[in-house]
Amino acid sequence: MTESHIDFRRAKFLISAPDIAHLDQYLPGDVGVEIAFAGRSNAGKSSALNALTEQKSLARTSKTPGRTQLINVFELDSQRRLVDLPGYGFAQVPLAMKNKWQQALGEYLQKRACLSGVVVLMDIRHPLKDLDMQMIEWAVASEIPVLALLTKSDKLAQSAKMKTVNEVRKALADFGDWVLVEPFSALKGTGKPKVLSILNEWCHPQWLRDELDTAEQSN
């Protein structure tokens, strides 16, 4: 069957949940396709989501890193969702709360069967911090593809930007095809077509294609 193009501008807020256990209570089971967005609290995750969906306030931006504690879910259609995970690595938050959030992130990556890809967002000026690597390792260990998205690329000159992109690609080369690395600017739109192409591919995992093919053949 022909792969359809997903219109990410149609994303709409579905639910918020405090952790993965509560997420299961709100969603129609561990079904469909989910793409998760994860990153440090200052990585520009909300701005990236808003830019990719062309909606100024789909994901709330905050001047206070770590304020967004909830898992926020946005619906693309009846089978596909975007999941905005809590920011990690924030400084002005109690240690117990940090540990709780990081545990929830790990549980989500390891237990959510419908997860077809994870976007790990990193400020291009400060990539590959310990928690970024942990998120990437968790995802790849669960055989979930990762897009390492280097945000705020407009902050660097072209030569410095490509130097950092190449350095990050080299650092993540051992993960093979499981990890892609791309620069991105929510402000300038740099990298947006490439990112949307990757997300669209993740929205059509092989199991879903097989399921839809079977449904077509039975009609």
From Swiss-Prot:
It comes from the Bacteria. Gene3D superfamilies: P-loop containing nucleotide triphosphate hydrolases. One of its GO terms (biological process) is division septum assembly. GO terms for cellular component: cytosol. Pfam families: MMR_HSR1. GTP binds at residues 39-46, 66-70, 84-87, 151-154, 184-186. Its cofactor is Mg(2+). GO terms for molecular function: GTP binding; metal ion binding. Keywords: Cell cycle, Cell division, GTP-binding, Magnesium, Metal-binding, Nucleotide-binding, Septation. Residues 31-205 form the EngB-type G domain. Mg(2+) binds at residues 46, 68. The keyword Oxidoreductase does not apply. PANTHER family: ENGB-TYPE G DOMAIN-CONTAINING PROTEIN, MSS1/TRME-RELATED GTP-BINDING PROTEIN. Belongs to the TRAFAC class TrmE-Era-EngA-EngB-Septin-like GTPase superfamily. EngB GTPase family. Necessary for normal cell division and for the maintenance of normal septation. This is Probable GTP-binding protein EngB. It comes from Shewanella putrefaciens (strain CN-32 / ATCC BAA-453). The gene is engB.
